[in-house]
Amino acid sequence: MSAPWAEWDHIVKIDPDKTLADGETFQDVCATGTDALEIGGTTGMTEEKMARVVEATAAHDIPVYIEPSNVGAVVHDEDLDGYFVPTVLNAGDVFWTTGAHKEWVRLDGDIDWDRTFTEAYIVLNPDASVADYTEADCNLDIDEVAAYAEVAEKMFGQEIVYVEYSGMLGDPEMVQAATDATEEATVFYGGGIRDYESAYTMRQHADTVIVGDLVHDEGADAVRETVDGAKDAAD
């Protein structure tokens, strides 16, 4: 049985530390046609902020996952479909590869392992908050990106490889390298998707595209265009 995300073309990532576009609701976001919602952010994450967004989105007929950046942002809620836990493979600080995860296990006795999945992040924009936060080595070539993707799938058994260019549109060849290096893992791509064309282009190289800032900056109509682009590229 394949994982549910293996069938997704598009995900909206909601940052609980940011507001939605003026006049919009979470119902508007859920109605864009996206395949799933991922709730999380790099900084400013708290359990209270996470819980607010989970409560507002879980009532809608769409898969909802949270991506906790620290143990204090974990929400235990039966309405959630699961937890996507980031491991940054090219982090300069190993805390973001295994350290934070060890602390979560040590401090939280209620982890639902059946609904917990890791994302193998490869961070490639040196100007992104996540790159600074994790001290990521973003100076990678295509062979190195492919190798990281293969390590994630073959050595660590990770089902999701996440090529992250947060804040800019990435190099399609880098994304394709990760896709070519994997056999069964799903390749997520995030970064700089602002319209139909960018979603269409990046979906041709990744299994799933993730749209984040756009939902906060421009709103549901703009997100809907990216959904159309991703879906058309998948056909």
Curated annotation (Swiss-Prot):
Major localisation: cytoplasm
Annotated catalysed reactions: sn-glycerol 1-phosphate + (2E,6E,10E)-geranylgeranyl diphosphate = sn-3-O-(geranylgeranyl)glycerol 1-phosphate + diphosphate
Chain sites annotated for binding Mg(2+): 15, 42
GO molecular function: magnesium ion binding; phosphoglycerol geranylgeranyltransferase activity
Annotated InterPro entries: GGGP/HepGP_synthase_I, GGGP/HepGP_synthase_sf, GGGP_HepGP_synthase, GGGPS_halobacteria
Magnesium found in the keyword field: yes
Known cofactor(s): Mg(2+)
Cellular compartments annotated: Cytoplasm
GO process annotations (BP): glycerophospholipid biosynthetic process
Binding site for sn-glycerol 1-phosphate: 13, 162-167, 192, 212-213
GO cellular component annotations of the record: cytoplasm
Family designation: Belongs to the GGGP/HepGP synthase family. Group I subfamily.
Protein name (Swiss-Prot/TrEMBL): Geranylgeranylglyceryl phosphate synthase
Source organism per UniProt: Natronomonas pharaonis (strain ATCC 35678 / DSM 2160 / CIP 103997 / JCM 8858 / NBRC 14720 / NCIMB 2260 / Gabara) (Halobacterium pharaonis)
The organism's taxonomic lineage, starting at the top: Archaea, Methanobacteriati, Methanobacteriota, Stenosarchaea group, Halobacteria
